[in-house]
Structures are given as structure tokens and as C-alpha cells.
């Protein structure tokens, strides 16, 4: 998660200061391309161990697609939130600026909202995640990179505000 939350430059600095002869272990629930590149750079004689079956999100998720003009996206989002029963909603934005903008507008519409992306401080990220898990926030707006690997119970709806670059 540290890498997902924007600590890659810090990890690189630490690794540069480590001795050449060392044992390095990397554990991850998912291995996106940037983590694979880091692993190839950091690990020597690496052994890859995969546990469990790979499952496609499509096996357990019902999908809906709403073609809408860009100018109407937020109005549709509000309509979906008002007309749908949910425990908690995770909204993905492609950009940090977009996530902030969506969150600000949702707050103006009386929704309890947390924001998660790499421009937030570590303290803000922890508070947002803990608040979302506890139910303090009904909506979490996040970039896809920031939210990778997060495990939150009772998320009833996931909304891709922007079309995702990768279907997972």
C-alpha cells in the first residue's frame, strides 16, 4: 500500500542506501506494472509465490453503464445516490483534481465524503480510510491507484466516475 499511496520515490531512496548483499522480500495482494518494475529493480534471484485463485471482478459484480454527456455526469451521480439504497459507495476518479472536485460537490449536496489520493497526507489518508470503514463517511472518492488493495467491508456500490483505463 505504501507504493500505491505515493511512497515509490522514498522506497527507491531507501533501497539505494541498502547493502548490495541483502535479502529483500516483497508482499502484495496485487502486482500492477509499476510494482513489477520496482520488483525487477530491487529483487535479486526472485521467487514468485502466488496463493489462491485469480478471480475476475465481473464474476461477483453486477455492472451498469450510463452513457451521459460530461456536463450531466455529476447530476447523474447525485440522482444515483439519491435513488439507490447503499451502505457505502466507492467512487473512482481518474485524477486527483477530479477526486477533489467530486468530493467538494458531494459535500455541498450533504453527503459525508472522504477523499483518498496521493496528494493527501498520510494522516489524511488514514483518517479517510478509517472514517469510511467505520461509517463516518458514506462515500469515498479516490483515484484508482490510491484505492488499489484497500479492503473495506460492506461497500455496496462502486462507481467509476471516469471510464477506467483498466477493467479490473
Q: Where are each of the predicted segments found?
A:
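Conserved helicase RecA-like core
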Residues: 1-168
